[in-house]
Regions:
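Accessory carbohydrate-recognition regions in carbohydrate-active enzymes
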Residues: 30-359, 363-410
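Bacterial Sec-dependent N-terminal signal peptides
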Residues: 1-30
């Protein structure tokens, strides 16, 4: 009868809802991130990087082993290399042109130097590890253990100095790209603010940063070719280092928050990590990756196939990158500061590469971000006069053919 049918229907409906909930909970509880191998693609012509980032994050904190802008140095790292020049906070994944490598820090021991041939260090892959949201390495020359993790807008460094002595942290704003404008503002002995405006593939890129140390650091020296006024330094050549006597095994922690808009934006974004618990941030990054990777569940007894699949999925989620501050402010195509209302603003639209495969995938597994991407396209059209072709840091690079943003919108 009708009553029995309705009762059965409601029972089945409740069962299916419960099953869907349990399936979702089970998928999210699984460790998909363990299958990710960030070293896949870092050799040959893969042009990927192994460093720490979260899905679609503003920060990609990774070692730089190539600084010459070469074809196989597009990501800043190549597996064949054995020298690390430093750890910078922005990197491109899988592109055919070099850029980024912004806000580079390098820990050293002994007499400091501004020469990257001197402050760089050899390293061994035997002492290097990477997983989703985490990277670590030992710097042979200085015997410093480096561990890196990140939130969306903040890079988190942990340096362990295995020898007692004079420890330094080098800040090199001339790292990789041409420096158009650099500034360093000393706030106090644990905080500095930085602007790096550079030119490479993106012809006018702005990166503001707030750098915080967990212990007081002595501002030891600066190299500048322009203005030096008290605690403010600027120029098109700008490097600085900060020093401290350390005991054997002592750790120094550094947080670097980024903003495309202002010093105030970088300070606001620093609130993503209000503490100095490295392990907590590392775990949170891993959780974010598991949440995103759980959108596609693949089972296999072949661990290599799982590594290939989930690393490929991981690589699709390393970009586009969020390009707005926590309050929604972003730098538009007109180089003015705007506020995103009702959507999130993104950058790095390699549309010639991504319109066929990546964007259809986003449409299936991430409808919210797909809407954000399209709204970003529309704002760039309003501010710059056309939809993006190959957009980078709110700059149109005009790279490759076609007008593939139309296909993504359609």
């Amino acid at each position: 009868n009708i009553f029995t049918f309705k009762k059965f229907f409601n029972l089945m409906k409740s069962f299916l809802i419960a099953l869907a909930f349990l399936t979702t909970t089970f998928s999210q509880a699984q460790d998909f991130a363990k299958h990710v191998n960030p070293f896949i693609g870092t050799g040959g012509h893969g042009h990927t990087f192994p460093g720490a980032t979260v899905p679609y994050g503003m920060v990609q904190l990774s070692p730089d082993t190539r600084i010459d802008g070469s074809w196989d140095g597009c990501s800043g790292y190549h597996y064949d290399d054995s020298t690390i020049y430093g750890f910078s906070h922005t990197h491109l994944n899988g592109t055919g042109v070099s850029d980024y490598g912004d806000i580079m820090l390098m820990p050293t021991m002994g007499e400091p130097s501004f020469d990257n041939k001197i402050y760089s260090s050899t390293f061994s892959h035997a002492n290097e590890k990477a997983s989703a949201g985490f990277y670590s390495v030992n710097l042979d020359k200085h015997d410093i253990d480096v561990r890196l993790t990140a939130s969306t807008r903040v890079g988190f460094h942990e340096y362990t100095f295995n020898k007692a002595g004079f420890a330094n942290i080098i800040l090199d704003l001339n790292h990789r790209d041409k420096l158009l404008e650099g500034t360093v503002r000393i706030i106090d002995d644990t905080t500095i603010e930085v602007l790096r405006r550079s030119e490479a593939w993106a012809r006018n890129q702005y990166v503001y940063a707030r750098i915080e140390f967990n212990v007081p650091m002595k501002f030891t020296s600066v190299k500048s070719n322009s203005v030096t006024k008290g605690d403010f330094y600027s120029g098109t050549e700008l490097k600085a280092y900060f020093s401290k006597m350390v005991k054997k095994g002592e750790k120094i922690l550094v947080k670097v928050s980024l903003s495309p808009t202002s010093y105030e934006g970088a300070k606001l974004n620093s609130s993503e990590i209000k503490h100095w618990d490295f392990e907590k941030v590392k775990k949170e990054a891993e959780t974010l990756w598991n949440k995103e990777l759980s959108k596609i569940e693949v089972t296999s007894d072949d661990k290599d196939k799982l590594a290939i699949f989930y690393t490929a999925l991981y690589h699709t989620m390393m970009q586009p990158n969020i390009a707005q501050d926590l309050d929604g402010k972003y730098r538009g195509r007109d180089n003015q500061i705007h506020t995103a209302e009702g959507f999130d603003y993104y950058t790095v639209f390699s549309l010639w590469d991504t319109f066929r495969g990546a964007h259809p995938l986003y449409t299936l597994i991430d409808k919210k971000r797909t809407s954000d991407y399209i709204n970003t396209f529309i704002k760039q059209y309003e501010q710059g006069g056309r939809l993006p072709v190959w957009e980078l840091a709110s700059n149109e690079t005009d790279c490759m053919i076609g007008y593939h943003s139309v296909s993504v919108i359609a």
